[in-house]
Amino acid sequence: MEIKLEKTYEINGEIKDTIELDFDKLTGRQLIQIEREFKKENKGELILVANNAFAAKVAAFCAGIKEDDILDFSGKDFTTVTTEVTVFLNS
């Protein structure tokens, strides 16, 4: 799924105004591993499906970029991306 961003960002040395979320490459095993990493980093915090921090971690994996790149997006772009992940996780 390609998402058009409002701003441009330097991601992996390239200037981008889109992000590609490849949910098809995400397996259940990988999703559980991302969840474990999230809980470890956040001292066991419960993962709510609408948790933006968890959604950002999933988005970074699906896009093949660093989580910090997602976290550096503008509020609007961050919300757009994490909302798409949340919709996917709820489907």
Features from the language model and the residues they span:
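Short, surface-exposed, charged amphipathic helix/loop patches that serve as local interaction elements
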Residues: 1-91
